[in-house]
UniProtKB/Swiss-Prot annotation:
It comes from Rattus norvegicus (Rat). A zinc finger (C2H2-type) spans 177-199. Residues 1-72 are annotated as: Disordered. S-adenosyl-L-methionine binds at residues 253, 300, 348-349. InterPro entries: SAM-dependent_MTases_sf, Trm1, tRNA_met_Trm1_C, Znf_C2H2_type. GO terms for molecular function: tRNA (guanine) methyltransferase activity; tRNA binding; zinc ion binding. This is tRNA (guanine(27)-N(2))-dimethyltransferase. CDD domains: AdoMet_MTases (cd02440). Residues 1-10 have a biased composition (Acidic residues). GO terms for biological process: adult behavior; adult locomotory behavior; tRNA N2-guanine methylation. Its EC number is 2.1.1.-. The modification Phosphoserine is found at residues 61, 603. The gene is Trmt1l. It catalyses: guanosine(27) in tRNA(Tyr) + 2 S-adenosyl-L-methionine = N(2)-dimethylguanosine(27) in tRNA(Tyr) + 2 S-adenosyl-L-homocysteine + 2 H(+).
Length: 723
């Protein structure tokens, strides 16, 4: 009976021995020596035939004793941390590896096989040869990643190449590597290096086979405006990351925050949408600093970005709502009673904007935004705000003119005022999209900097507003010789000589066709002074010091007033109002309140009166475009300082201000001829070789009387010589 019991248990023990993995905690007992085995061998009647030592399990690694069993069952044997771990697999022992040195080359049953090579490919009759094989072939050309080595494998493994459809299986596979992250099989070492690098660029540095407790997060934590966010290691490369974060767009995020803060003073709560969340930094700033005044929705189509947005919400102790279900981190959220909830969605931006209505929509796609304008104006609420950030500056700044014609349907060339031209192109596209939805727009401000073009408009519902908006889209006549420009006159009649509209006389003095037609462009004002002053107040209230100089420049530019004549801090004028200790100048046409103090909308008569008032005050709008003082400097003359020249233009009776589009640009209602004449009047001739080297010319500020030039000097300045 005992022999029968042993025979019944023996197959079970064999099966357990085949799946047993040698680990540091439970090492397999080494096989007894040949002499000892013969002495203790049972009788032939009761003993089965002597079996070979069980081969090591090829699917598990002994170096992961602390990893869960599920992780161990999936990790391939070719992935090891040390060479000793690989040798343990080969010799099947944890202790003295030299115990296998007693192998006899004459005993064919004790031939050692490589755990990563088939038997027909490699056979070792000595432990030394097996060690050299493991070290020189498998370990030497392995790929290292986070302390682990992906050794080359020659086994007949199943080729795995994950795709959207599923796993692709091929019939032939030679030497290959097993990816530690996605278990894909890669044949070449260089391809394996590139494969792992792509995982790192996407932020997929955690192995699927390592538990979350042992894996270290490779995401970097950044802080901007008291908001913490996690970003991927390659967050600054938009082509290779799922969640792009650009630190250079900080001004863009701050000015949009001031816009939303100014709108939140009109009505509460606001339903806001960040259609392209990426890391969610913008929506997090809205919810964290404005609290219950806003209901923020952050959307992104990428699954990894949505996961990262949820992590950033928990990092900033904000409640996350996904599919009408509230997800909380657990601890730390009880103190956030003033912070608003954030709804995170994963769908196409066009679909989301068609399904829901919002008071504030921000569009910041990668490139042009024309594909999302129709859906943005489809359901935006009346008197809501739509902000559009365009980063396709190569087409807007006339470097790729065919792309601008394709996306915006306009003809442009490179001019001295190309940044304002880009802003007017985007506003025209926004206005046309709003008009298709029977809505008009009021431009609150437009900003064009080095990296982006930002346009913010207020939506006015109704076909009347749409018609008024459509009338403000006109063509521009641009002179290619002197760069004078003017918008075409209203009307559909064809003029016999359109060159007469230009103030310059280049067509009569120069041969050929001298002017081109640009556009269609937005021809009305680009700034709302009252709204900009409220934005300045919000920036001071929230402590955004970086954006205040830009907003002040926009205010001066909207009023077309030099900064020396208009100060936002000096309460010297009775027409100025105080906002939190900051005095800002107010005019009759700047304060436009659509909502009463109780947050309710005023009557339609009030809105009609406001529209009439805007129409009567149209003459106070700032002049379009600007001149670059360096571009029109006179040869052989030293031009005056910029501040002094602004005062000279103002004293001559022209409206003048600086512009944010160009640091050396001057916005004025003077024509180019008048601009050059005043520049010539206050310029001084350059000192030539007759002056000694040590003599320093007098500074321009000390010059009180303008320099009178003779007729010959004027002729030389204009480029002509009088004989």
């Amino acid at each position: 009976m005992e022999n029968m019991a042993e025979e019944e248990l023996l197959p079970q023990e064999k099966e357990e021995a085949q799946v047993r993995v040698p680990t540091p905690d439970s090492a397999p007992v080494p096989a007894p020596a040949a002499d000892t085995a013969l002495d203790s061998a049972p009788t032939p009647d009761s003993a089965p035939a002597p079996a070979l030592a069980p081969a090591p399990a090829p699917a598990l690694s002994p170096s992961l004793a602390s990893v869960p069993e599920e992780a161990e069952s999936k990790r391939h044997i070719s992935i090891q941390r040390r060479l000793a771990d690989l040798e343990k697999l080969a010799f099947g022992t944890e202790g003295d590896v030299d115990s296998a040195s007693s192998l006899n080359s004459d005993n064919l049953e004790n031939i050692q096989t490589c755990p990563l090579c088939p038997k027909e490919k490699f056979r070792a009759y000595s432990s030394h040869k097996l060690r050299r094989h493991l070290q020189n072939l498998h370990w030497k050309i392995s790929v290292e990643f986070e302390g682990s080595r992906m050794c080359i494998c020659h086994l007949a493994c199943r080729p795995v190449k994950p795709t959207i459809v599923g796993e692709q299986i091929s019939s032939k596979l030679g030497a290959h590597y097993h990816c530690i992250i996605c278990s894909a099989t890669i044949t070449r070492r260089t391809d394996m290096l590139g494969h792992v690098k792509r995982h790192v660029n996407k932020g997929e540095t955690k192995s699927r086979y390592i538990s979350a407790s042992t894996a270290k997060s490779s995401n970097e934590v950044l802080k901007e405006t008291d908001t913490d966010i996690q970003v991927f290691p390659n967050y600054s490369i938009p082509q290779k990351t799922d969640s792009y974060f650009n630190p250079k767009m900080k001004l863009n995020r701050q000015i949009i925050f001031c816009t939303l803060a100014a709108l939140a003073e009109e009505r509460k709560p606001l339903e806001c949408l960040d259609a392209f969340g990426a890391t969610g930094i913008m929506g997090l700033q809205w919810a964290k600093h404005l609290g219950n005044a806003v209901k923020v929705t952050i959307n992104d189509l990428n699954e990894n970005s949505v996961t990262l947005i949820q992590k950033n919400c928990h990092l900033n102790k904000l409640k996350v709502v996904v599919d009408s279900e509230e997800k909380e981190e657990g601890d730390g959220l009880e103190d956030c009673s003033t912070a608003g909830d954030i709804q995170v969605t994963r769908m196409d931006a066009n679909v989301l904007m068609h399904l829901r209505s919002f008071d504030f929509i921000h569009l910041d796609p990668f490139g042009t935004s024309v594909n999302y304008l129709d859906s943005a104006f489809r359901n935006v609420r009346n008197l809501g705000i739509v902000s559009v950030t365009s980063t396709d500056i190569s087409s807007l700044y006339a470097k790729a003119q065919h792309v601008a014609r394709r996306h915006y349907g306009c003809n442009i060339v490179r001019t001295e005022y190309y940044k304002e031209l880009a802003a007017r192109i985007v506003v025209a596209a926004v206005a046309r999209a709003a008009a298709r939805c029977n809505k008009g727009v009021e431009v609150l401000f437009a900003v064009a900097l080095e990296h982006f073009v930002l346009v913010v408009v207020r939506v006015l519902r109704g076909p009347t507003s749409a018609d008024e908006t459509a009338k403000k889209i006109q063509y521009l006549i641009h002179c290619q010789w002197c760069e004078e420009r003017i918008f075409q006159k209203d009307g559909n009649m064809v003029e016999e000589n359109p060159y007469k509209q230009l103030p310059c006389n280049c067509h009569g003095s120069m041969p050929g066709k001298t002017a081109i037609e640009l556009g269609p462009l937005w021809s009305s004002s680009l700034f709302n002074t009252g709204f900009l002053k409220r934005m300045l107040f919000e920036s001071i209230h929230h402590g955004l010091d970086d954006i205040q100089p830009l907003i002040k420049t926009l205010i001066f530019e909207s009023e077309c007033t030099p900064q020396s004549q208009c100060s936002v801090h000096a309460p010297s004028n009775t027409n100025k109002q105080e906002e939190n200790g900051v005095f800002v100048k107010t005019t009759d046409d700047t304060t436009i309140d659509i909502y009463s103090a109780q947050g309710k909308r005023k009557s339609n008569e009030m809105a009609i009166n406001v529209a009439k008032k805007q129409k009567t005050d149209a003459s106070t709008a700032h002049p379009p475009f600007y001149y670059n003082i360096h571009r029109h400097s006179i040869k052989g003359m030293n031009m005056p300082k910029l501040k002094k020249f602004l005062c000279c233009l103002s004293q001559a009776g022209f409206r003048v201000s600086r512009t944010h589009f160009d640091p050396m640009g001057i916005r004025t209602d003077a024509s180019l001829t008048q601009f050059k004449s005043i520049l010539l009047k206050y310029s001084t001739p350059t000192y030539t070789g007759g002056q000694s080297e040590g003599q320093v010319p007098a500074p321009e500020d000390t010059v009180t009387d303008p320099v009178e030039l003779s007729v010959n000097d004027k002729a030389e300045v204009s480029g002509c010589r009088r004989w």
